Amino acid sequence: RIARRQRQMCIRDRNNTDDLVLASIIAKHTKSNCIIITKNQQLIGSGMGQVSRIDALNQAINKSKKFGFNLDGASLASDAFFPFSDCVEISFKNGIKSIIQPGGSLRDIDSIEFCNQNKMSMMFSGIRHFKH
């Protein structure tokens, strides 16, 4: 369970745990593929039901911006791992600073290295959520 924070793996210590937990809970109940963006304990963007994780991310970012939310310092949850670092890179370019995802990709190290180089936080929950 995501509420058991001691089971999460923190890649950096600069995360906003409350926003990450909220985003993960929302992602659990959202149609896959989904990306959830939270800030200050509120949902500010969601992308769901997309074929690709990048499409879900772009949908969530665009919705956030359309409704006037500032993404600087926001948190993001994904219902599945990132097979490449592309979503992490797009998130960073848009101001997102912390991410929670299940982990388990053969290329997790690419995302970890990008986060470390750019002072982002990333947590691995070890839990995949798929709702089709």
Q: Language-model features: where?
A:
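Active-site loops and adjacent core secondary-structure elements that bind or stabilize anionic groups
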Residues: M9-C10, D19-I25, T30-C34
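Catalytic cores of large soluble enzymes that bind and process phosphate-bearing ligands
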Residues: R12-D18, A27, G45-S52, A56, ...
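Short beta-strand scaffold segments in enzyme catalytic cores
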Residues: C34-Q41
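C-terminal binding/interaction regions
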Residues: E89-H132
